[in-house]
């Protein structure tokens, strides 16, 4: 709305137009060249370019290096396997994005298709995208407002701005007000002058906020950190090994070949694919619970969320007005008040207030009685008189009216005592978040104030329990709404969220005036239970402030106004019946109404996270174990403990069965979880070095007691690395003793056992290597599993020292 009220002539002068003739066609064309089309610009990326982008990032480079190294040393089987892993990772990511609706496209579709415009003195229908500032347009009931329009002629409009501002009730507009692009006309008809089009509209600025909202997931950061750690470690160790071997006079070609194979084994090429598949399977589980995952990394983000910002209207509440406790006055009964109000309502108008009153009449069994009355004349609500009125006949004739309490008091010529009483009631209702409606009846030659009907948007039936469960999961829930503070406080109290509700608009004014600093603003936002009088840019700011305080933030919403914050949040959740724009901006889309399904989604996300963390610890442990053992054997003993072929077989047999980790049974964490890289790397390194010790011990046993040849020793060590490696996953999969519940899933257990058996047959029978026989193979089974118990003890000591749950 204008800060200074302008008259029609001033507005015409401002926009160089006339409400009598509109713009000329030529002038409209000129302005179209200046301002562009009234639409949301669409940034299109060719699908091939988008697909190739999945192979141009640090994670992909890591895998591509491994593939190139494999090709250089002509290990074609390894080369093909790595390429498959690379493609799996790329295809999963591309398909996930391809299926997800484009945010900008949906926001564009939200724009009105056609508009009634006055050009060259004639009214005509044109595509809404051709509107320009200064155009004179006509909007009426049922229209989607095609641009930001200054209303200059007509009685009034009632528009639904809930998808834009979050206000639960339609808003009244009069001359001088602005009807915003994307809002829906519920009542009335007015003429206006186009103020802004496209991205310059209030709606368009929302799009800019969506485009501005960019985020890098903690999953991506974790992958890069682990990749950097392992690659740097591998490069340093391999460089030392190559230097020492060349100093010893070994063949450059032979040394380089082994070094390249070792480098390939050190790069966790399968890690992104395994983690993507784990998240994809988790996404399927969530889909069964009516939560559609659009971006796989959102699962990992949701597991770590510690603050949930929930939109109020339609998410925590029904977005449907209902009547509170009826207050009857002047000797009238509650039934009388509802009867009079119902007679002053029309069902066919589908007005939110009228529907609430008629529903209350149905509850009180008054509908049959109402049918006996005949409405002779009905005066609908308008912003000028602020009430409805009906002339009614039955056995007698009388009038009824409902509207703003102050207006009804004036209609009744109420005395001071009644006015004071009604005003006290209205003030008390307002403090508790209710809107008040006055009701009067005209009998015996005068109007009588019959009573007051409180109205409010009630919480969903499932909301209080959902809020309680979310809190039990260690997640703080904050309510966000465009409604006034009193309404927000009432709903927050009813839901058990808390009553520390602040007006974000007032807080931002203080920030702008310099009364508080940015740090203080962020602190107040962090401590608040909820926010009232919120606009789209405010929601974005709220999420940003919480993120700056170190929180992982989830945001639920259903309207266009929620889209920027949904995109900015670590995990954006579009609830059931959300607008296309909200769905497009979100990471997760709920199909069931309310937020109860979020409880299931958080629990499932945490289970998925546990599986991912187990695999990450396992993968780092194995890389360290093999790298250090091979390196030290070469440097200290001058022996290659395994061949290049064995390293390739290890890579295949170790990673393929571990895909089953996606189906493993896990303990659900009771609080938000995050990638604790320090703890993960310390635990992995300790278990990896323990594996190095156990490998040297078996090396010693083989040489001193078993007197194996070098070829047999290599086969023996190969079997040890496979069996002990697979035993590691049983150690890392649970933060308790490995024999405690939950037990491994059947798929994981038999997947591991199957590859263990294959590895045993290969070593015992001498396939691709020297045979060691079944006696030594069985001995190795016993040795590997005894050491598994030792590793489990090391794990428990470290978990206690590092205070990891």
From Swiss-Prot:
Gene3D superfamilies named among the record's database cross-references: Calcium-transporting ATPase, cytoplasmic domain N, Calcium-transporting ATPase, cytoplasmic transduction domain A, Calcium-transporting ATPase, transmembrane domain, HAD superfamily/HAD-like
Active site, per annotation: 311
Membrane topology: Multi-pass membrane protein
NCBIfam families in alphabetical order: ATPase-IIIA_H (TIGR01647), ATPase_P-type (TIGR01494)
Protein name: Putative cation-transporting ATPase MJ1226
Principal location: membrane
Taxonomic path: Archaea, Methanobacteriati, Methanobacteriota, Methanomada group, Methanococci
Catalytic activity field: ATP + H2O = ADP + phosphate + H(+)
